[in-house]
């Protein structure tokens, strides 16, 4: 396949698939199949075009969604958010969150709005 638009269309299908499945971890094989590529070729293409692995991209999407939920649903238990986003435990979620953002989910929630979250994350990053 030599047509860039076809690559874009197929990559778009893979990205949409990942976004629809934030509630669980998806495998490289699943996402590659959705885009009609071999896992090897898809991995190379995905990293070249996005700068991320499939697992890294999905983790980032899940953690970005977590920030939205922490701010928009301040009364919702963090463990419930973690479970909905496919993390096996709230401790696993908190560890992933802290490694990615440099802050705990509760400290992000305490910011209260997206502007303050952005300021806090810029200090870290």
Model regions and ranges:
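Terminal helix-turn-helix DNA-binding modules in bacterial transcription factors
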Residues: 12-29, 49-84, 111-125
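…primarily DNA-binding HTH/wHTH and HhH modules…
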Residues: 1-5, 71, 95-125
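Basic/polar phosphate-binding segments, predominantly the helix-turn-helix DNA-binding elements
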Residues: 1-2, 13, 25-61, 82-104
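Proline-rich intrinsically disordered, low-complexity coils
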Residues: 4, 39, 74-77
